[in-house]
């Protein structure tokens, strides 16, 4: 059920026109893969929710990460975190995979993205090698959070979105 909610949340937060409802095309351990049509082009994405979320918060929305391919826009490997709260202005978001730390993110409300395609590719490469990823952030109220994601099934899910959306 939680995975279905992710599909609906991602779909409802998209602002593109002429979309279909996302269709699940695979589930690989802790990762789920979806596709839909947007302006007559395939969009493929994979999503996961944290295995553990930590922080001294009283209320928090849905938390998940997404990797998206939009071949119609020549956009691939877009990494996105949805924190379940609005980020504090100018706060730092970090992703840690093993000993590698990625901190080149920008935020907008409850979402964070890497700063560049190069950062996306480096992060995804590390995710393919890793076992887990820890995302740390700070809410607009100053609450620090730490979310732990499993990377089990990540590589198979990633290969699926690559094949479905024509990324070589």
Annotated model-derived regions:
Residues 19-168:
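A generic "folded-domain core" signal
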Residues 4-14:
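Sec-dependent N-terminal signal peptides
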Residues 1-4, 31:
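Positively charged n-region of N-terminal signal peptides that target proteins for export
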Residues 1, 16-18:
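...the same signal can extend to comparable exposed beta-sheet modules
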